[in-house]
Amino acid sequence: TKSGAITNPDFEFLARQFIASTGSRIIERAKAIEETFGVKTIELVVAGFGGALIPDALREELENYFNGNKVLGIEAAALTNHETTVVNYTPQVINVAVQIVTTLKSKEQFENAIANLLSPSAKFEDGTTYRWQFGGLVPRAILIANLFDVDPVNVKNVILTTPAVDIILGDRSLPNIGTISVTLVES
């Protein structure tokens, strides 16, 4: 494993491997952005497991890990003279309103499909590749296809009214589910 950070991918990898004072890893997603706060700075945007926001004290631990802290006797993991500032990702709340023409009677499986898809932790079927990237796009077509996939035989039509357009995530954003409104129309 790596023990020091030089490149942005190094910072991202080491953030995900970091063991906090809690005794466990706390970072699921990380994105390093150079020179946000001036020359020789790294902004490390982080998301906890399941899209959790990281508390101040744990972000400070991660900063001490990268920057070092002589008072606490912590050697810097950053091998360059960059100062690392750790910030939480920005949850991009996405509300969903949809009408589904189907023979199915329960909304729960559709609500679960939406909630699982619009999670910062959502992955493709390979189980390793994250579906959503910082600064990426959340296409309506993916939401619609995901709902058809709940039961391709019994779902006849999906009418997505919210969101009305594809969602563009900010550079520091990942999707988070807002309110879900599913209306079933018997076919």
Model features per residue range: what roles?
Residues 87, 107-187:
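An aromatic-glycine-centered, glycine-rich loop/turn in mixed alpha/beta architecture
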Residues 2-136:
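Carbohydrate-recognition loop of C-type lectin domains
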